[in-house]
């Protein structure tokens, strides 16, 4: 029988922050387009090492309201917000990504910043 590895106590786990964002563009965008744009701009701006340290992770995107959630390390929130503002083109069409807010939990992020867009 294989034993499960022990889980890390909360004091040793990575502290994450969740960033809510909204995309405004010439046309509606799909989830994969947004994910690729965030990843590409992050690599260009922060480099491979900076991106690895910031740990940006695409959580969710609603294609109807064009809003989504990105997770990152708490020390690199400003860098990821900067990366989001640098996105000017997604898949050949112009776009603007606006940061709605930052929170420590997805539940609180949805309540504070994404409730007006119909998130539950």
Swiss-Prot record:
Its EC number is 3.1.26.5. SUPFAM superfamilies: Rnp2-like. The keyword Hydrolase applies. It comes from the Archaea. GO terms for molecular function: ribonuclease P activity. Its main location: cytoplasm. Keywords: Cytoplasm, Endonuclease, Hydrolase, Nuclease, tRNA processing. InterPro entries: Pop5/Rpp14/Rnp2-like, Rnp2-like_sf, Rnp2_archaea. It is found in: Cytoplasm. It catalyses: Endonucleolytic cleavage of RNA, removing 5'-extranucleotides from tRNA precursor. One of its GO terms (biological process) is tRNA 5'-leader removal. GO terms for cellular component: cytoplasm; ribonuclease P complex. Belongs to the eukaryotic/archaeal RNase P protein component 2 family. Consists of a catalytic RNA component and at least 4-5 protein subunits. Part of ribonuclease P, a protein complex that generates mature tRNA molecules by cleaving their 5'-ends. This is Ribonuclease P protein component 2. It comes from Thermococcus sibiricus (strain DSM 12597 / MM 739).
């Amino acid at each position: 029988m294989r034993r499960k590895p022990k889980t890390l106590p909360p004091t040793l786990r990575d502290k994450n922050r969740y960033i809510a964002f909204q995309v405004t563009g010439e046309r509606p965008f799909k989830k994969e387009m947004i994910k690729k744009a965030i990843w590409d701009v992050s690599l260009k701006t922060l480099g491979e090492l900076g991106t690895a340290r910031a740990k940006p992770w695409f959580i969710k995107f609603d294609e109807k309201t064009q809003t989504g959630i990105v997770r990152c390390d708490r020390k690199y929130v400003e860098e990821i917000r900067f990366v989001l503002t640098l996105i000017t083109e997604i898949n050949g069409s112009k776009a603007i990504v606006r940061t709605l807010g930052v929170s420590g939990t997805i539940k609180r992020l949805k309540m504070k910043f994404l409730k007006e867009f119909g998130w539950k």
